[in-house]
Amino acid sequence: MYERASPYIYEDVLMAETITLSVTRFDPGRDSRPRLQGYEVPYRDDWVVLDALNWVKSHMDGSVNYRWSCRMGICGSCGMNVNGQPKLGCSAFLRDYLPGPVVVEPMANFPIVRDLVVDISSFLDKLRWVKPWIIRDETAVGPGEHRQTPAQIDLYRQFSMCINCMLCYSACPVVPIEPEFVGPAAIALARRYQLDSRDRAGQERLRTLTGSDAIWDCSFVGECSAVCPKGVDPAKAIQQTKFESTLGMLMPWGGR
């Protein structure tokens, strides 16, 4: 998953036309601060930023560090900032940044491990905290299936599309100000299970989210939803959770 290169798919590329790729370089054992390093890479109309990075690693500088895996916008591994905007490296086409340069930086609001690789441990801790999985009452798995209607699935379908790419954390203006803010993706995934008819931990999860500033720190700017590559609306999930929590405080049965 880390630092792979696939030189065999780039051998037929000619250097007739190039574009400048400016990549953040940072070695914590040597550098006091991140710096940008420029590379002239081949330009092809069908290339994305990840292709250009793979070219650099395979042909110019094998020390460049970044994460990637599927190259298909599914795994969420290759999140980075491209010309200041949170993007998946496998979905950001070079043609959209002509004539260049294309400035590739690590995602904002995360500690840098090295070059484009960031430390995501805080996100993983927050994700575990909201319990994004189905919790049932029974002590053992019961017989049969837990069937759902199309209408029941549609309630949470959008939020289930999250791929944990963390672009929403890079875009969120609250995360750098309130580091303890649970954040968009974690709340969206919590909402996904809140709306799942098979789940039985709705009130427990809601108390977890509302018992601190987990949701109330959100200022509803909506940048998280704007940058999501899968069309998830974390801002909507946060507002829905706020509304449900408010009903629970004002009405004896949570508005039911």
What are these regions (language model features)?
Residues V82-V104:
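Glycine-rich phosphate/adenylate-binding loop and adjacent beta-alpha elements
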Residues E3-L14:
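Short, Lys/Arg-enriched N-terminal segments with co-localized hydrophobic residues
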Residues L36-V48:
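Short, contiguous acidic and Ser/Thr-rich linear segments
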Residues V41, N65-W68:
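A cross-kingdom feature strongest in bacterial/archaeal respiratory oxidoreductases
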Residues A16-G38:
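Eukaryote-biased recognition of intrinsically disordered, low-complexity regulatory segments
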Residues W47-G62, E105-R256:
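Ferredoxin-type iron-sulfur electron-transfer modules in oxidoreductases and energy-metabolism complexes
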Residues C70-G79:
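Short, structured protein-protein interaction patches enriched in aromatics and acidic/basic residues
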